[in-house]
Structures are given as structure tokens and as C-alpha cells.
Design a protein with these regions (language model features):
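Non-catalytic surface loops within mature trypsin-like serine protease
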Residues: 75, 106-108, 152, 175
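Short Pro-Gly-centered flexible turn/kink motifs
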Residues: 60-75
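Short edge beta-strand/loop segments characteristic of extracellular beta-sandwich folds
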Residues: 88-90, 101-108
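Glycan-recognition and catalytic cores of secretory/periplasmic carbohydrate-active enzymes
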Residues: 80-86, 95-99, 114-145, 152-170, ...
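Extracytoplasmic/surface-exposed domains of secreted proteins
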Residues: 26, 34, 52-56, 62, ...
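Trp/Gly-enriched beta-strand surface patches
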Residues: 1-62, 110, 123-124
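Exposed beta-sheet edge/beta-hairpin loop segments within beta-rich domains
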Residues: 56-63, 363-369
């Protein structure tokens, strides 16, 4: 079986014809497709692949290079139809003291305007709380928007907002609204389930067995992988194509869908967690992580801080790869298409026996901006791990400092990344070399404040220079005016300019 040629073995179509009508029973969903040439064929997408949808196709006639397939698509139009109002509230809920605004999305052809009703859900049913007058916000993209402010309501409980026949989901107002089920599921479920090189249990359930314990073989040179990884004419390491590289069968989280480990995903997630740990002093324990036996137990505390255990897990992959390869890996990914399309237990991708044909490949690259960004992420992770895994912390810092020292800067993108690395290394070490580099590049930082402001601001106290702080503040004030203007362009009060 090969996913690329799966369609060479065409299953029988459900139906064949020149016209196809979808949902003829529903005027609001009905549409018709008519082919002016080759017949339409309706397939079950599960036959040749595992696609959970129906497939409508026409075969391209042999030798036809223009006008090979011509379809006419006719949606059914219901005169006077209007999109129903959509009432939007926070999915998390609200703290009693915070601003509370419900936003109602309206069809732009709907002239009607009404009041909204805030109701409380009690053990005896609904109790009216307040009639809300809307603020006309105006048009954003395809819709008109109204805003209904109910900040004054602070009594804790369950609520919903109703506008005409539409209503919001039920939400909470409570002082403990952020204590459960907000960011916590990332630590409780998402990251543990994605952990590579582990068996992940949750009571009776096994999310996946020990996987990829045979990682990884050096990728072939001059190879453009089907997922987009590119190995150039050299491996950039002492290893030759096909060599088993030690130190890679530990740590990391699976990328969604194809289970690969990208350096920016691994180091980047560690960075997110490290900054959250520092900013909010997160101390949360719901999971057992046993690195020695490569076992994870979800919802079984082990007395160790989960966020630090996850930073450790990511750094084991990044630092392990760096120390084995002498450089960062670009990514670790399966070598065969049959593995790439795997739906099921990640442990089924390889046999966990090093050195055979099913082992994943490790790719390398020469990419200064990515290497310097990773240096910043390594430095921050090193801080978080100090006192938790001192050896790994020291190795992460060594890698960060070496990357900072040896990576060349040839363009603004690389310079921005080196400023990022300098800021985090200054916070980690306090060394003058990093402080001096930030001071030398003050003008560049101010000029690129949109991208570098948050980075420089993190280090401003460590730089401890009045001129640096003053110039940074001036640039930040200009940026704030720009962001305020962008935020005013949406009913949600956040900037939105699609690329």
C-alpha cells in the first residue's frame, strides 16, 4: 500500500451522472453541480484513504489540456434569508471585578435592533437579572456588531445572554473562574498525551505506548522530504546518511498529525512554559512523569511541578540532539509515506529497534535566525530548570551561549534573533557581553519595536541604563498608539489585520 498511488485502485462510485444535487430536502443547504463534460462520480472517501467525507469528481479526458473539467455550481438562494444573530460571550466566564461585554453578531442586511436580556440560571430555573441596551459598533468584515456591557453585574453564579430568539452558551461569573479548566488542561492532558518517547497512561486508558525509541537515523543528503524538510549536500555533522544518532530517543512532543519533532516547536514550547513559570510562579501537579522508565500517568500526582517536568521533557530532546549532533536538529520525522499517514497509536510507527529501515530520520540545517531564536529559548529554559534538573539546566545554557557565539548574523532577521538571544542570556547570566550587545543595537530595537519591544522590555531592568529605557519607552508609546488604532478597528478590541 502506498498513499500516493492509492487512487490508482479506484473504488466503485456510489453514483454516476451529469448533475448532482446535495441536500435536496433542505432549501437552506441545497446546491447543484452540473458537469458539461466528463460525468460526475460520487465516492465514499473512506475507500481509498481514510477521509471522512464524500468525494465528487470528474475524470480528466486523456490528452485534454484546456477546458478539461467544467462544472457549473448552482447554490439555492432563499429570498429574504438573514443569518440569525449570534451572541458571543467569554467561553471561560468572568471574574466578578473584570469588564464583561457580550457581543452580538448580526446579518448586515438585518435592520432590526433590540435589547438583550441577562438571565441567571438557578436551581429553580431562569431568573431575569438585567435588560441590556446595546452599543452600535458597526460593520466588521461581513457582519454588523452590537456590544452589550454588563460589567456592573458581580454576583457569582451561572448566566446567559439572550437576544431575540438567540442566546449565548451558559457561562460563570465567579472569583475562581480561572482556577480550573482554562490553561490547566494543557498541562493535564494536551502536553502529556503528545509526549514522545514515553508510554502515556490515564487510569485504564493508554493514550499511546512507548514510541520512537529507535530515534533516529541521519537523513539522506540532497533530499527534499515530503513534509518539507530539506537536507542539503552535507549532513553538517560527523554522521553519515543512515547512521544511527544517539541521544535522540528522549523527550519532545509530537506535532499534530504526523508525529514529527520540529526544533521550533520543541524549544518554542519550552520557552512558553518557562515564561509562564517565571511570570506566574506556576506550581501545579496532576501528572506523574517517570523519565527513567519512560512512563507518564495522567491524573496521578508525583509531588513534582508539572510545568517544570514538561520543560525538562522538551529540553531533553533539544539539548540531547545538540550534544549528539554538535548542532541543532531541524526536525525528526518518519521516512516512509505509510508512516506519515498513520492514524492510530504512535507506537505503531516503528518497531523501537535501532538501525532498521523504519527508524525516523533526523534533518539538520544552516539557519542562523532559527538557531539564534532557539538560543534565546534555551537560555530561558535553563533558568526555569535551575534547581529542578541542574545538569540539564547547565547543558541548555552551554548550548545557548555557544549558539550565540558562533552563529553568524548576515541580515535583519538574524540580528533580531540575536537580540532575542542576548536579552534572555542577560537575564540568565547577567554577563556584560549581552548587556553591551543590547545597548549597541538600541536604534535597531527602537526601529523594530513592533517585533522586538516585548523582548527588550523583558531585559530593560537588567540592562539598567537610563537612556536605553527612555528610548524604549518612546518607541513603545508610538507602538501603543498604533495598536490602539488597530484595536479600535474590531468589535473585540484586539488588532486584526490578516496577512
Amino acid at each position: 500500500y502506498n498513499p500516493i498511488v492509492a487512487d490508482d485502485l479506484i473504488a466503485e462510485p456510489y453514483a454516476v451522472g451529469q448533475r448532482f444535487t446535495c441536500r435536496p430536502d433542505d432549501a437552506y443547504s441545497r446546491f447543484t453541480i452540473e458537469s458539461e463534460g466528463a460525468p460526475l462520480k460520487l465516492y465514499d472517501g473512506r475507500m481509498n484513504h481514510n477521509n471522512g467525507w464524500f468525494v465528487l469528481s470528474s475524470e480528466i479526458p486523456e490528452g485534454k489540456t484546456e477546458g478539461a473539467v467544467r462544472w457549473i455550481i448552482k447554490p439555492n438562494v432563499v429570498p429574504g434569508w438573514l443569518s440569525a444573530p449570534v451572541v458571543q460571550v467569554s467561553q471561560v466566564g468572568y471574574h466578578p471585578a473584570q469588564p464583561k461585554v457580550a457581543i452580538v453578531e448580526l446579518d448586515r442586511n438585518d435592520p432590526a435592533r433590540g435589547q438583550a436580556a441577562l438571565v441567571k440560571i438557578t436551581e429553580n430555573g431562569e431568573v431575569p437579572v438585567q435588560t441590556l441596551n446595546g452599543e452600535e459598533w458597526g460593520q466588521f468584515l461581513r457582519y454588523e456588531y452590537l456590544r452589550f456591557d454588563f460589567t456592573a453585574v458581580q454576583e457569582e453564579g451561572l448566566y446567559k445572554v439572550r437576544y431575540g430568539a438567540s442566546e449565548s452558551a451558559i457561562f460563570r461569573i465567579a472569583s475562581d473562574v480561572y482556577d480550573r479548566g482554562v490553561w490547566q488542561p494543557v498541562l493535564e492532558y494536551f502536553l502529556p498525551v503528545q509526549m514522545c518517547h514515553m508510554r502515556v497512561n490515564e487510569k485504564y486508558r493508554v493514550w499511546h505506548d512507548l514510541c520512537h525509541d529507535d530515534d533516529a537515523r541521519m537523513a539522506p543528503v540532497n533530499r527534499n522530504h515530503f513534509d518539507g524538510y530539506v537536507q542539503g549536500p552535507s549532513t553538517l555533522t560527523k554522521y553519515q546518511p543512515g547512521d544511527s544518532v544517539p541521544g535522540l530517543n528522549v523527550g519532545g512532543w509530537h506535532d499534530a498529525g504526523d508525529f514529527d519533532l520540529r526544533i521550533e516547536s520543541q524549544a518554542g514550547e519550552c520557552y512558553i512554559l518557562a515564561l509562564a513559570y517565571e511570570a506566574f510562579n506556576v506550581n501545579y501537579d496532576a501528572t506523574t512523569v517517570d523519565q527513567a522508565h519512560k512512563v507518564v500517568e495522567i491524573h496521578q500526582p508525583d509531588g513534582r511541578n508539572d510545568i517544570l517536568q514538561q520543560i525538562e521533557h522538551g529540553m531533553l530532546s533539544v539539548v540531547g540532539g545538540y550534544r549528539s549532533l554538535g548542532r541543532l536538529y531541524r526536525g525528526i520525522i518518519c521516512s516512509h509515506l505509510r508512516q506519515y499517514v498513520l492514524l492510530g497509536d504512535s507506537a505503531a510507527m516503528t518497531k523501537n529497534i535501532k538501525g532498521d529501515d523504519d527508524d525516523r530520520w533526523v534533518f539538520t540545517e544552516d539557519n542562523p535566525p532559527r538557531e539564534l531564536t532557539t538560543a534565546a529559548q534555551l537560555a530561558a529554559s535553563s533558568r526555569a530548570l535551575k534547581g529542578f534538573n541542574d545538569e540539564l539546566s547547565a547543558h541548555a545554557l552551554e548550548a545557548a551561549q555557544e549558539l550565540y557565539r558562533v552563529t553568524r548574523v548576515e541580515d535583519d532577521k538574524a540580528l533580531s534573533a540575536k537580540i532575542h538571544a542576548a536579552a534572555e542570556l542577560l537575564l540568565t547570566t547577567g554577563e556584560e557581553v549581552y548587556r553591551s550587545f543590547l545597548l549597541e543595537n538600541l536604534n535597531f530595537i527602537a526601529k523594530n519595536i513592533k517585533n522586538l519591544g516585548w523582548i527588550a522590555a523583558r531585559a530593560v531592568k537588567a540592562v539598567n541604563d537610563a537612556h536605553f529605557e527612555s528610548e524604549l519607552r518612546k518607541a513603545m508609546q508610538t507602538l501603543k498608539q498604533e495598536l490602539d488604532q488597530l484595536s479600535a478597528e474590531t468589535p473585540y478590541g484586539i488588532p486584526y489585520h490578516p496577512y
